[in-house]
Every structure is written in C-alpha cells, then in structure tokens.
C-alpha cells in the first residue's frame, strides 16, 4: 500500500514569519507538521505500507504520483488549499483521506472533499483504517468518540523531513485545557481533561528532535502549564539534559498569564531556555473576560504578571482580541497603552470570532448576531455583528492598531522597555559556542537592516543596539534575534493593512484616520 501524505501550503499570515525567514535564508518554513509524521509512526508493523511525505511549504506536489491513497491534513487557514488538492487527485481517480483540526471542527464541509474522513484524534482510528483498507472494508468516516490516552501517541517519525528546512521543531507534551472559554474550539478538539505524556516520553522526543538537528523546539500544547508539579519536574529534566550539550536547545510554548504569578515556574522556564511564551491574554477588561466565560483569569493582574515574566528574560508574546460585547471605541487606545506600560514588544491583535459549535457561536446565532455565510479569514474579519462598535470601527480599528504597534518609534519604545526590565541571566550554562551559521545569520541581519529597509526602521535598528549595549551587552544576541522577528511583523502589517485591507486608498476605498484609535469616529 502506497500513501502520499500532504501538508498543504499555508497562506501568508501573521504567524508564518516569512519576512524573517527570507532574510536568514537557511529555513524554508517555520515548523514541520507533527500530525502526519505521527500517522507514519502509528503504522502497524505487520502491514506493508510505504509513505511519501510532501510538505508543500517546502516542495511542490507531484500531481501524477503513483499511489493507492492521498492523505491530507490542515487547519482552517489551509482548507481552501485542501479542497483544491483533493479535487485534483480525485480527478485522477486517487482516493483521498482528510483529517486534522479543520476536519474535526467542520466535518460537514470536510466530508464533501474526501473519500475517507477522520474526525478527532487519529491514534486509534488510523491503524484501524489501514487494516480495514488492506481487508477491503475501509469506511467513509472514522470518528474517535472518546479522547485517547495520549501516552499511546508515539513520537513523530522525523526521518521523512530535513531539519535545515524548518526554523522550529514542533512537539507536544499534552492535550486538553481545563478552561472552557466561549469563543475557543480547542476543547472540542482535545477536551477539557488535561492529558500529558510521561516525562520519559517527552524527553525521548526532545532528544530525538535534537539528534535530527533541532536548535529550537516549540511545544504546541494549548496550555503548557496546567499541572504545576508535572511542569516543574519536566522543566528540571530539560535543564539537566540541556546542560550536557555544547549548544543548548531553546524552547517556546503557549500558556496563560497565570504563569506570571508563579515565580518558581518562571525561573525554571528561564533556566530551561524558554525564549518566547505566547500568552492568550485576550483583553484587559474584566467584564470582557466574564462575558466569554474566562473569569478565572480576572484574579491575575496583567500589569504585574507580564513584567515579572520579562524580568527573567522571557519574551511575553501577548495575544489580544477586539470585538467583545463590552469593548467600546476606546479599546484600541487601551490596548496600545497597556502594551506600552508593560513593555511588551510583540502582540497579535485579532478580531473576535465565533467558531462553529462553540458556546459563543450558539449565543450569537440565538441573538441574531451571527453572519451565517461568513467567508472571511479569522484574523481579518468576523462572523459576529459587534455590539458597542460599528463594523467600521472594529474592522479598521484593528487594522490601524496592528500597523501602529509595529511602526519603528512605537516598537523601539516597547523593546527598550523590555530590555531594561530583564534582570535575570541564567548562569548554569557554559558559554555557547558560535557556529558558522549563526555568524552568517548575524551578518545577513546587519546587511538587511543597513541597506534594505526604510530609513526609520534602519534608525530604530541602530538605536536599539546602542541602547542594548548600554543596558547590558549580554542582551545583544537577544536583541538581534528580536529585531529579525520584528521585521516580519513590520513587513506583514504594512502589506496586510495597506494592500489587502483597503488602507492605501486604491480603488476608491475610504482611508480611515487614526481618530479611530483614540475612540473617536
């Protein structure tokens, strides 16, 4: 049996880091698709199955590939491409299997583009499907009715990829989130019960990724810190292992702001070389948190916990959402001021959406505020009719704020503030050896910011480096890496806002002024 597994090309988006990757030139895309590589590892040893793996972000699809089955996975952002790929292969009489996040959340739509549909986790259903296929009894739909024991999930088979193509390696230590936020569809995919792999399993996967060439590992858990005792033990194990390496591995992950209230956890994260943590703050308005069933976060003051994370040299990447019922036109200025006061360099600004089958979706539908035929992208528009903001205020306010945050003068102020906040430098590692690639990367970054950027960005670059040297020379390397990351967000915010969002005045579009950001229209 020959199976062609395809990870569809991801459209250009805020998270893709295309601008930064293009400068360095070593990596072709941000991270590998863990799901498909896990499917390969799930194959029963007594079956004769040959896999061909294609990451379309790395290499083109071979449309005339001789195979018995095509397997496609994908997120919501990839669904349009998933449908196109499936149609092309079905025209060639190749049966197609589809699974993943989108298929689980929107099975009705996914079923239309495939011959075999996988809903939910596939650790148990994929091996069963392979056996059914061999026996000639494969079903149309395979649905995992209960959440699996994640300890049964094997390490992804990394032998099908090349480390040089990826900036990060993505691994998963746990699934499930005990929270039940009204707008979040995670609990439908992974459940509310927290399930973790064993520490031995996780460390084997980390060591395996490192052996394949991983320099940075992203733990894709929706909430990395749920079981405090488990997290402490895992971080201690990572530290012990990392200290044995000539070139220690760096990490990043996702969590809630509650970690900032736990200084022991924050210090361990810093000692384990966690460089960036995405924090789903969403809003600083307590009423907004209550309205979407996220009241458990009200007790944590973001003005205190976020600077505490920064003090340990960890970059807090703040996830903000606009468009809650309690949001007024003042929300954009409030977010800007908050990011300034907490010296948070990086932030995403999304518009509140109601994914299918979430409590928010049902509430908006019941209240007559749901746009049923919504065809937009989650990070650009919304399927909700806002309450205290006009669609114009919400739509353009988000775009203008997003663009403003990454203007040189505003980013420079926040980044220098962050650098000044850093007080802790782990002294448990020997001086990191300088590899040739890192030297070449730094040269490329300096070349880019010296010769290929607008004058205000170039001035910001040198201002930040001079200030960094004054604050603490040990932060120079971090500053250069952050500036590389910054370029992607600056470049993307200009392209996305001006060209795609009608902020450039082309085609007769009205260009809104920044009074929206001051709560005035």
Model-derived features: positions:
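A structural motif corresponding to the C-terminal end of an alpha-helix
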Residues: 39-50, 212, 272, 305-316, ...
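Radical SAM enzyme core and accessory elements
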Residues: 2-5, 12, 25-26, 48-52, ...
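Short, electropositive alpha-helical surface patch
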Residues: 61-62, 67-69, 234-239, 328-344, ...
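Acidic, low-complexity intrinsically disordered segments
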Residues: 1-214
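Flexible glycine/acidic-rich beta-alpha junction loops that bind and position SAM and/or redox cofactors
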Residues: 10-16, 106-109, 179, 227-229, ...
């Amino acid at each position: 049996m020959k199976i062609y597994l395809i990870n569809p090309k991801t459209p250009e988006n805020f998270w893709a880091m295309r601008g930064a990757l293009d400068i360095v030139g070593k990596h072709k895309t941000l991270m590998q698709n863990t799901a498909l590589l896990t499917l390969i590892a799930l194959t029963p040893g007594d079956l004769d199955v040959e896999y061909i793996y294609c990451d379309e972000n790395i290499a083109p699809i071979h449309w005339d590939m001789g195979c018995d089955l095509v397997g496609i996975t994908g997120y919501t952002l990839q669904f349009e491409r998933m449908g196109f790929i499936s149609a092309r292969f079905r025209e060639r009489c190749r049966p197609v299997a589809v699974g993943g996040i989108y298929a689980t959340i929107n099975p009705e739509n996914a079923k239309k583009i495939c011959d075999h549909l996988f809903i939910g986790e596939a650790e148990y259903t994929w091996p069963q499907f392979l056996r059914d296929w061999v026996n000639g009894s494969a079903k149309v739909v395979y649905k995992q009715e209960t959440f699996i024991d994640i300890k049964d999930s094997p390490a992804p088979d990394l032998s099908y990829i090349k480390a040089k193509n990826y900036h990060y390696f993505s691994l998963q230590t746990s699934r499930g989130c005990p929270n039940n936020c009204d707008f979040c569809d995670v609990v439908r995919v992974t459940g509310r019960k927290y399930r973790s792999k064993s520490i031995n399993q996780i460390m084997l996967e980390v060591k395996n990724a490192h052996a394949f060439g991983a320099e940075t590992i992203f733990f894709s858990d929706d909430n990395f810190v749920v079981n405090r005792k488990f997290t402490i033990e895992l971080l201690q194990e990572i530290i012990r292992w990392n200290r044995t390496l000539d070139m220690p591995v760096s990490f990043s992950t996702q969590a809630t702001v509650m970690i900032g209230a736990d200084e022991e956890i924050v210090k361990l994260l810093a000692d384990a070389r966690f460089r960036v943590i995405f924090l789903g703050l969403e809003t600083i308005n307590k009423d907004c948190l209550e309205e979407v069933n996220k009241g458990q976060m009200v007790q944590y003051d973001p003005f205190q916990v976020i600077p505490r994370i920064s003090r340990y040299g960890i970059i807090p990447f703040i996830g903000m959402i606009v468009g809650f019922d309690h949001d007024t036109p003042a929300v954009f200025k409030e977010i800007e001021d908050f990011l300034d006061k907490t010296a948070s360099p990086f932030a995403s600004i999304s518009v509140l959406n109601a994914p299918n089958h979430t409590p928010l979706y049902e509430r908006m539908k019941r209240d007559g505020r749901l746009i049923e035929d919504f065809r937009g992208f989650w990070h650009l528009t919304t399927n909700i009719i806002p309450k205290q903001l006009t669609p114009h205020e919400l739509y353009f306010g988000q775009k203008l704020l997003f663009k403003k945050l990454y203007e040189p003068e505003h980013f420079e102020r926040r980044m220098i503030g962050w650098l000044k906040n850093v007080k802790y430098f782990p002294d448990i590692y020997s001086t990191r050896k300088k590899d040739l690639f890192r030297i070449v990367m730094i040269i490329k970054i300096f070349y880019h910011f010296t010769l290929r950027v607008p004058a205000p960005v170039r001035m910001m670059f040198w201002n930040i480096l001079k200030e960094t040297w004054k604050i603490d020379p040990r932060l120079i390397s971090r500053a250069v890496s952050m500036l590389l990351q910054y370029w992607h967000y600056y470049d993307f915010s200009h392209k996305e806002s001006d060209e795609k969002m009608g902020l450039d005045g082309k085609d007769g579009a009205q260009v809104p002024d920044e009074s929206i950001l001051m709560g005035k229209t």
